[in-house]
């Protein structure tokens, strides 16, 4: 079965077309990447060793073309919007990673995603060797650095399990992207965008408790308290041990307070 690396970029295209009303088309967003593929093919010979081709691709993308992550504002939702990323050469690590995977597949280069717990990592496989690349800036990451990141997330002494550095399960990668996109929109209170995106995701996954939870959070921000209450109660009932459940229970108390205010207004 083919490991379809362009699919993560497809998720970005779908995301932007759902949330945006700026007239961008799927053909335009794919054409932008097609232009980069043509430029890369002019610069990278398929006759070179794979290591050299990978090195040159990273130099082109992060060096010559100037794609980067800005440490001051990389977390803003706009860094997931493809037109913004192409215009400003700036995005989140996952955005830039998706673009590198697209280029790698077009050039037949063995670069794959890793669902590392702390962030997306790129995995280059050449012969029997594996190297890891940070999509933030295209630099190589040592095993020691990966271990430091892991301990930073899970505590001193926590050890990376070998399977955590394998090629990503694509369905998990897509779910992780969808959650990141929802979180960014909700955090910035882009409520209409978030609601439309979640509604679209639920066309094929209507009972997903995380989509229902996030719809509830959006509805709460929009002031639709009874509907929000219903969604958040559903989530707590179905995912009581989820790490976010305690926060959601607090939200439920606040929502009930807001509903009671509306039911018994002060005179």
Swiss-Prot record:
Domain of life: Bacteria
Family matches, as Pfam families: TPR_9, Transglut_core2
Cystine bridges: none
Segments forming a coiled coil: none
PANTHER family for the chain: F-BOX ONLY PROTEIN 21, SI:DKEY-261L7.2
Family as reported in the entry's similarity comment: Belongs to the UPF0162 family.
Name of this chain's protein: UPF0162 protein HI_1558
Origin species: Haemophilus influenzae (strain ATCC 51907 / DSM 11121 / KW20 / Rd)
Top-level taxonomy: Bacteria, Pseudomonadati, Pseudomonadota, Gammaproteobacteria, Pasteurellales
